[in-house]
Amino acid sequence: MKPDYKNWIPKGMMFSLIAGTALSLALLLVFGVFGIEVGGKLRVVLGVVFGVAFVVCAKYTQWCVYAYRSFSYDGERKLSKQIIDGTAEHITLPEGGVGLDIGCGSGALTIACAKRNPQGKMVGIDRWGKEYASFSLPLCEKNAAAEGVENASFRRGNALKLDFPDESFDAVTSNYVYHNITGADKQALLLETLRILKKGGTFAIHDLMSPGRYGDMQAFVQKLRDMGYERVELMDTTDGSFMTPKEAKRLMLRGSTLLVGRK
């Protein structure tokens, strides 16, 4: 059985854009070009409206197809896999230790960390909202079974308020989650995540950490150091480590940064 981690670009969105492009082109030809049953100013107006709609839909369809192919686990680029594996490399569990993946989606990062740390266990949590309907708890469990991973489990949880006591886990990780939580203070989310990390535990949090979303992250790094964290580092993953600057720009992933270290 092969795991199905799903694409970060939902098929439904891509097919909707393709359908919208085809429909707007058909309407442009019928009313704007051939002027079937319309004429004069109305023909011109409809031609402009459907022409603009076609150009916009075609542009977004082109981007969507490119992004889908880039992220696909079955494609040549496999960018999602590179990001997941690259993030998992920074998670280390002690013998019998437990790590937490926040916003686990289809379970890819949870499972990757579990495979790298057979001496411990990984827990993946997510609220599995309607906006990401292709991700689910049963899907995560199926993927773990497909990978032959027995040291990973999944449950519902909310990144805004983690239902765990302080210093509960030996490692915490997350990938492209917090930027999706609108209205939340991103640095506060990071502190909430690190609250449940044990002293000496490792962390690797990957997200779009642009100043507009996260504020001054260099100051945040210094804050953690002042709090006694053993090691804290910000890594720009658009420098070729995960993706090239060109890919980051085309895929709207500029600002991709990995916050790693040890508490």
Please tell me what each predicted stretch does.
Residues 228, 241-263:
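Core SAM-dependent methyltransferase catalytic element
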Residues 200-207:
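Conserved beta-strand signature within the Rossmann-like core of class I S-adenosyl-L-methionine
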Residues 160-172:
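A short acidic, Gly/Pro-enriched loop at the edge of an enzyme's catalytic core
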Residues 78-96:
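Conserved alpha-helix/loop element of class I SAM-dependent methyltransferases that forms part
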Residues 95-105, 123:
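Conserved class I S-adenosyl-L-methionine
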Residues 106-118:
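Conserved SAM-binding loop of SAM-dependent methyltransferases across substrates and taxa
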Residues 12-16, 62-83:
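Class I SAM-dependent methyltransferase Rossmann-like catalytic core
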Residues 187-199:
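A short glycine-rich, Lys/Arg-flanked "PGG" loop and its adjoining helix->strand segment in the class I
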